[in-house]
A protein has these predicted regions:
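Conserved catalytic core of two-metal-ion nucleotidyltransferases
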Residues: 13-59
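Conserved beta-strand elements of beta-rich interaction domains across eukaryotes
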Residues: 4-7, 44-47, 57-59, 78, ...
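Eukaryotic intrinsically disordered and solvent-exposed regulatory patches
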Residues: 24-27, 35-38, 93-99, 123-124
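Acidic, Ser/Thr-rich intrinsically disordered and amphipathic helical segments
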Residues: 11, 15, 38, 66, ...
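N-terminal regions immediately upstream of nucleotidyltransferase
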Residues: 4-12, 30, 55, 68-69, ...
Length: 263
């Protein structure tokens, strides 16, 4: 989030996008027809994606970041679970709210919801990440009904959605119709974090399939149980290789031995 800029509105976004064109990014795209315009840039052969936005009256990204930091301090398992599940959504093309996926904030809220429920039952014992992952996948993949239920983070509960929508003058459903996924925003009660998640059906199928893969893998020999969530030659392995080449060059190009000392 950029807090200050010298341009106005779309002008500032296009100015920055033009400047970034000179910095070696693989792809740069300005998305303007949203509540908060954003610049999306990718690098590393499309493996690394960054969103850039400008602070303004409608922008709540800084408040969101503060709240997420708070959740991470409260729930030890939130960070690793978010990394794994975010990568799963990246692989399935469901991580981008601008194309009907679930935002990172929305995913974090869902994970925090499950972790809170587990703490209510188990007390302050050390979190079992494997069990927490299974519970998340089972609840949001098989049990949660997005058409009839919403998630409240303020009250930490599932709540029923209205069974009927207001009618227009002709007796039909008035626009806009109900959002595809309801996740209350604890930083802004009037905002639904899941309002743009039109791929919620596919999202829940991904969680359900991941659960089956993890459960089945527990009774098999060899391989990573967690890795069964991801396909062969998958995106996450390409990310691992990119990180190794970027941050662990000695693994790919061993250091030359030091020259022998002169006699």
């Amino acid at each position: 989030v950029i807090e200050r800029c010298y341009g106005e509105g779309a002008q500032a976004h296009h100015q920055l996008a033009s400047a970034l064109q000179l910095e070696g990014w693989d792809e740069i795209k300005v998305i303007e027809n949203t509540g908060v315009p954003v610049i999306k840039v990718t690098s590393g052969g499309g493996l690394i994606s960054v969103d850039i936005s400008f602070d303004g009256p409608a922008h709540r990204g800084l408040n969101t970041a503060t709240f997420v930091s708070y959740l991470v301090t409260v729930h030890d398992g939130l960070h690793p679970l978010a990394l794994v599940l975010k990568q799963l959504l990246v692989e399935r093309g469901l991580n981008d709210p601008y194309s009907g996926g679930l935002s990172s904030f929305g995913l974090v809220l869902l994970i925090a919801f499950v972790l809170h429920q587990r703490r209510q039952r188990n007390g302050d014992v050390a979190e079992n990440l494997g069990e927490a992952l299974e519970e998340f996948l089972r609840f949001f993949g098989d049990e949660f009904d997005a058409e009839r239920q919403g998630i409240s983070i303020q009250k930490w509960q599932v709540f029923p959605l209205p069974t009927s929508l207001p009618a227009d003058d002709d007796g039909g459903i008035s626009a806009p119709a109900r959002d595809p996924l309801t996740i209350e925003d604890p930083t802004n009660p009037s905002n639904n974090v899941g309002r743009s998640c039109f791929g919620v059906g596919a999202l829940q199928r991904v969680f359900s399939e991941a659960l089956r893969a993890v459960v089945t893998a527990q009774g098999s020999e060899g391989g990573s149980v967690l890795g069964r969530m991801f396909g062969q030659g998958s995106h996450h392995m390409k990310v691992v290789e990119l990180v190794k080449r970027t941050w662990c060059p000695p693994e790919y190009a061993p250091l030359e031995p030091p020259p022998a000392a002169a006699a």
